[in-house]
């Protein structure tokens, strides 16, 4: 009987902890939302937007969420014209939806995957090849 009561008490405690939406340090965990206005471009006005220029290409990057284990992130990214070869495995599994522009991915075996605005693509972390674009925005 003690075992049943203890198991029930632990179950109630754990479910209450999970359902309360609190972290270990008692912070409330909230969903990360990207609004229609953000998607239309307002997100790039956020104060935490990171702008970088490398070899004449300017990128805008806004991270809206990084998981507590650091293995998952969300946000929006905009890039100008760029072409680069990825000779080492990509390093992360990535899914994204293209809002504007297009990206052409040429795999190491020559297979061409062109993804346009309104389409999505998933890149496995083992992927190598050429990334080519005249510019795009992705979520």
Regions found by a protein language model. Give the residues of each.
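Positively charged n-region of N-terminal signal peptides that target proteins for export
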Residues: 1-4
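Hydrophobic helical h-region of N-terminal Sec-dependent signal peptides
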Residues: 6-10, 14
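A short, N-terminal "cap"/entry segment at the start of jelly-roll beta-barrel domains
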Residues: 19-71
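Conserved short histidine dyad/triad with adjacent acidic residue
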Residues: 73-90, 124-125
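Short hydrophobic/aromatic-rich beta-strand segments that constitute the beta-sheet cores
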Residues: 74, 86, 105, 138-139
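Short, conserved beta-strand element in jelly-roll/cupin
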Residues: 90-105
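Short acidic-glycine-tyrosine-enriched beta hairpin
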Residues: 109-125
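Ligand-binding loop in jelly-roll beta-barrel domains
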Residues: 125-139
């Amino acid at each position: 009987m003690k075992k049943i009561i203890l198991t029930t008490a632990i179950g109630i405690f754990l479910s209450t902890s999970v359902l309360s939406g609190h972290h270990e340090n008692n912070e409330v965990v909230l969903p990360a939302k990207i609004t229609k206005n953000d998607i239309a471009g307002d997100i790039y006005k956020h104060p935490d937007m990171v702008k970088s220029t490398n070899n004449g290409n300017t990128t805008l990057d806004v991270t809206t969420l990084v998981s507590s284990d650091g293995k998952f992130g969300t946000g929006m990214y905009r890039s100008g014209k760029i072409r680069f070869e990825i000779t080492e495995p990509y390093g992360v599994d990535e899914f994204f939806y293209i809002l504007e522009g297009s990206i052409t991915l040429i795999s190491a075996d020559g297979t061409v995957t062109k993804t346009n605005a309104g389409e999505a693509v998933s890149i496995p972390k083992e992927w190598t090849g050429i990334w080519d674009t005249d510019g795009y925005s992705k979520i």
